[in-house]
Protein backbone atom coordinates (compact mmCIF):
# COMPACT_ATOMS: atom_id res chain seq x y z
CA UNK A 1 0.00 0.00 0.00
CA UNK A 2 1.30 3.42 -0.89
CA UNK A 3 2.15 6.25 1.47
CA UNK A 4 -0.90 8.49 1.35
CA UNK A 5 0.50 11.39 3.38
CA UNK A 6 0.64 13.68 0.34
CA UNK A 7 -3.17 13.34 -0.02
CA UNK A 8 -3.78 14.57 3.51
CA UNK A 9 -5.52 17.92 4.03
CA UNK A 10 -8.32 19.43 6.09
CA UNK A 11 -11.57 17.67 5.30
CA UNK A 12 -10.01 14.26 4.63
CA UNK A 13 -10.46 11.17 6.76
CA UNK A 14 -7.62 9.44 8.56
CA UNK A 15 -8.15 5.70 8.98
CA UNK A 16 -6.05 3.74 11.44
CA UNK A 17 -4.36 0.89 9.61
CA UNK A 18 -5.19 -2.66 10.66
CA UNK A 19 -1.80 -2.96 12.38
CA UNK A 20 -2.38 0.14 14.57
CA UNK A 21 -2.46 -1.40 18.02
CA UNK A 22 -2.37 1.75 20.19
CA UNK A 23 -5.69 1.66 22.04
CA UNK A 24 -6.42 5.38 21.53
CA UNK A 25 -6.48 4.90 17.76
CA UNK A 26 -7.19 1.21 17.12
CA UNK A 27 -9.69 0.96 14.21
CA UNK A 28 -10.53 4.64 14.37
CA UNK A 29 -11.88 6.99 11.74
CA UNK A 30 -10.82 10.61 12.20
CA UNK A 31 -11.71 13.77 10.31
CA UNK A 32 -8.79 16.15 9.75
CA UNK A 33 -9.62 19.76 10.60
CA UNK A 34 -6.17 21.28 10.31
CA UNK A 35 -3.07 20.14 8.46
CA UNK A 36 -0.11 22.42 7.77
CA UNK A 37 3.64 22.77 8.28
CA UNK A 38 3.16 23.09 12.07
CA UNK A 39 1.24 19.83 12.42
CA UNK A 40 -2.22 18.31 12.24
CA UNK A 41 -5.42 18.22 14.27
CA UNK A 42 -8.28 15.73 13.89
CA UNK A 43 -11.28 14.32 15.75
CA UNK A 44 -12.12 10.63 16.21
CA UNK A 45 -15.59 10.00 14.76
CA UNK A 46 -16.26 6.48 16.02
CA UNK A 47 -15.60 6.72 19.78
CA UNK A 48 -18.88 7.77 21.40
CA UNK A 49 -18.76 8.25 25.15
CA UNK A 50 -21.26 6.93 27.69
CA UNK A 51 -22.45 10.36 28.78
CA UNK A 52 -24.44 13.05 27.03
CA UNK A 53 -23.56 16.62 26.12
CA UNK A 54 -26.12 17.94 28.64
CA UNK A 55 -24.34 16.05 31.44
CA UNK A 56 -20.89 17.46 30.75
CA UNK A 57 -21.04 20.76 28.86
CA UNK A 58 -22.44 23.86 30.52
CA UNK A 59 -24.83 25.91 28.40
CA UNK A 60 -26.07 22.85 26.51
CA UNK A 61 -28.52 21.44 29.07
CA UNK A 62 -31.08 20.56 26.38
CA UNK A 63 -28.69 18.54 24.19
CA UNK A 64 -29.31 14.83 24.77
CA UNK A 65 -26.78 13.66 22.15
CA UNK A 66 -23.75 11.62 23.19
CA UNK A 67 -20.34 13.21 23.56
CA UNK A 68 -17.50 11.70 21.53
CA UNK A 69 -13.88 11.16 22.51
CA UNK A 70 -12.15 13.42 19.99
CA UNK A 71 -8.69 12.20 20.88
CA UNK A 72 -6.14 11.90 23.68
CA UNK A 73 -4.98 15.55 23.67
CA UNK A 74 -6.52 18.17 26.00
CA UNK A 75 -9.42 15.95 27.02
CA UNK A 76 -10.80 18.76 29.19
CA UNK A 77 -11.66 20.84 26.10
CA UNK A 78 -14.90 20.72 24.10
CA UNK A 79 -14.94 20.97 20.30
CA UNK A 80 -17.69 20.64 17.74
CA UNK A 81 -18.33 19.98 14.07
CA UNK A 82 -21.57 21.12 12.49
CA UNK A 83 -23.37 21.75 9.23
CA UNK A 84 -24.59 25.30 9.88
CA UNK A 85 -21.72 27.67 9.18
CA UNK A 86 -24.32 30.12 7.88
CA UNK A 87 -25.65 30.53 11.43
CA UNK A 88 -22.55 30.31 13.64
CA UNK A 89 -19.93 33.07 13.53
CA UNK A 90 -16.31 31.98 13.58
CA UNK A 91 -16.93 28.62 11.93
CA UNK A 92 -14.19 27.22 9.72
CA UNK A 93 -15.35 25.21 6.70
CA UNK A 94 -13.26 22.03 6.49
CA UNK A 95 -15.16 20.58 3.53
CA UNK A 96 -18.29 21.72 1.70
CA UNK A 97 -21.13 21.92 4.21
CA UNK A 98 -19.06 20.80 7.24
CA UNK A 99 -17.70 23.35 9.71
CA UNK A 100 -15.41 23.24 12.72
CA UNK A 101 -16.01 25.41 15.78
CA UNK A 102 -17.50 28.84 16.07
CA UNK A 103 -19.22 30.90 18.73
CA UNK A 104 -20.41 28.52 21.48
CA UNK A 105 -22.95 31.02 22.83
CA UNK A 106 -24.58 31.27 19.40
CA UNK A 107 -24.56 27.50 19.11
CA UNK A 108 -26.17 27.08 22.52
CA UNK A 109 -28.91 29.58 21.63
CA UNK A 110 -29.59 27.93 18.26
CA UNK A 111 -29.84 24.47 19.82
CA UNK A 112 -31.89 25.54 22.83
CA UNK A 113 -34.40 27.43 20.65
CA UNK A 114 -34.74 24.62 18.09
CA UNK A 115 -33.34 26.65 15.19
CA UNK A 116 -30.58 24.07 14.90
CA UNK A 117 -31.12 20.34 15.40
CA UNK A 118 -28.77 18.09 17.40
CA UNK A 119 -28.37 15.92 14.28
CA UNK A 120 -26.53 18.87 12.67
CA UNK A 121 -23.72 18.82 15.22
CA UNK A 122 -21.21 16.49 16.83
CA UNK A 123 -19.46 17.33 20.13
CA UNK A 124 -15.99 16.07 21.09
CA UNK A 125 -13.89 16.03 24.24
CA UNK A 126 -10.25 16.49 23.33
CA UNK A 127 -8.64 16.00 19.95
CA UNK A 128 -5.92 14.07 18.18
CA UNK A 129 -2.88 16.19 17.43
CA UNK A 130 0.50 15.74 15.80
CA UNK A 131 3.47 18.09 15.71
CA UNK A 132 5.36 18.88 12.51
CA UNK A 133 6.67 15.68 10.92
CA UNK A 134 5.07 13.33 13.47
CA UNK A 135 2.07 12.25 11.39
CA UNK A 136 4.21 11.94 8.27
CA UNK A 137 6.50 9.53 10.14
CA UNK A 138 3.47 7.49 11.22
CA UNK A 139 2.31 7.30 7.58
CA UNK A 140 5.77 6.05 6.59
CA UNK A 141 5.42 3.31 9.23
CA UNK A 142 2.10 2.28 7.65
CA UNK A 143 -0.04 3.41 10.57
CA UNK A 144 -2.63 5.38 8.57
CA UNK A 145 -4.68 5.49 5.36
CA UNK A 146 -6.70 8.39 3.96
CA UNK A 147 -10.22 8.49 2.57
CA UNK A 148 -12.73 11.04 1.38
CA UNK A 149 -14.96 12.52 4.06
CA UNK A 150 -18.66 13.19 3.72
CA UNK A 151 -21.47 14.57 5.84
CA UNK A 152 -22.94 11.06 6.05
CA UNK A 153 -19.75 9.64 7.58
CA UNK A 154 -19.11 12.57 9.93
CA UNK A 155 -22.61 12.48 11.41
CA UNK A 156 -23.09 8.70 11.25
CA UNK A 157 -24.14 6.79 14.35
CA UNK A 158 -22.93 3.46 12.90
CA UNK A 159 -19.86 3.58 15.13
CA UNK A 160 -19.13 -0.15 15.22
CA UNK A 161 -19.14 -0.48 11.43
CA UNK A 162 -17.62 2.89 10.49
CA UNK A 163 -13.99 1.78 10.27
CA UNK A 164 -14.68 -1.38 8.23
CA UNK A 165 -17.08 0.34 5.86
CA UNK A 166 -14.77 3.28 5.27
CA UNK A 167 -11.66 1.15 4.71
CA UNK A 168 -13.65 -1.20 2.46
CA UNK A 169 -14.86 1.77 0.36
CA UNK A 170 -11.25 2.33 -0.75
CA UNK A 171 -11.57 -0.87 -2.80
CA UNK A 172 -8.86 -3.30 -3.91
CA UNK A 173 -6.59 -4.70 -1.22
CA UNK A 174 -8.29 -2.50 1.39
CA UNK A 175 -11.34 -4.77 1.22
CA UNK A 176 -9.23 -7.59 2.63
CA UNK A 177 -7.84 -5.30 5.34
CA UNK A 178 -11.36 -4.20 6.32
CA UNK A 179 -12.44 -7.81 6.82
CA UNK A 180 -9.41 -8.86 8.87
CA UNK A 181 -10.00 -9.79 12.52
CA UNK A 182 -8.90 -7.31 15.18
CA UNK A 183 -6.46 -9.80 16.68
CA UNK A 184 -5.34 -12.09 13.84
CA UNK A 185 -3.09 -14.08 16.18
CA UNK A 186 -6.15 -15.27 18.10
CA UNK A 187 -7.94 -16.48 14.98
Swiss-Prot record:
SUPFAM superfamilies, per database record: VC0467-like (SSF143456)
Gene Ontology terms: cellular component: cytosol
Top-level taxon of origin: Bacteria
Record InterPro entries: AlgH-like (IPR003774)
Family named by the database record: Belongs to the UPF0301 (AlgH) family.
Name by which UniProt lists this protein: UPF0301 protein Ppha_2142
